[in-house]
Amino acid sequence: MESNGSGKFPGAFNDRILTKSNRDVTIMMGKTKKHIIYFAEDKVLNIDQKDIEHYLSEVKDAVEKDYYRLDRNARRQDNINLFLDYVIDEVKAKEIILSLTAMDFSEVLRNEHTGFEHERLYVFGKDVVLLERTGTEEKTVSLYIKFNKLENSFVIVISFHEQKYPLTYYFK
């Protein structure tokens, strides 16, 4: 979208201008350009902080009621490694999830597994201090946390591990 010549975009967009290529949606907030949503669909999505706060509220409600699962199976070795490398248990993981805020939100992804393409996966990041299991040092660990909230409100924590690359945060 072109600027109106003043360097500003039309006010009708409230500083949230989304553009789309074949797979990539980009948002402009003020002068900041962020890639946020990766869909191959022909629609533009608009997410605001209230949307994420609502989503997190539903996730936290499920977690508080133990209506969730943190995946630690053979396909989720990175999740297992977090629990092997640091002194962390399910209780601490639950505390971390319950401490998430909209400011920790990074992006929404489409589930790429065949038959589940309609599902949306929400990615968050969180810096936490954890004790290394093989040492005496505490370390600030940047976590990558990805949720799938199913239609029945059950939450699957698909990813809960150290970030492999720095995340871009949507509201920061």
Locations of regions flagged by a protein language model:
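Compact soluble domain cores
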Residues: 7-9, 13, 21-124
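Functional cores of ribonucleases/endoribonucleases
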Residues: 102-154
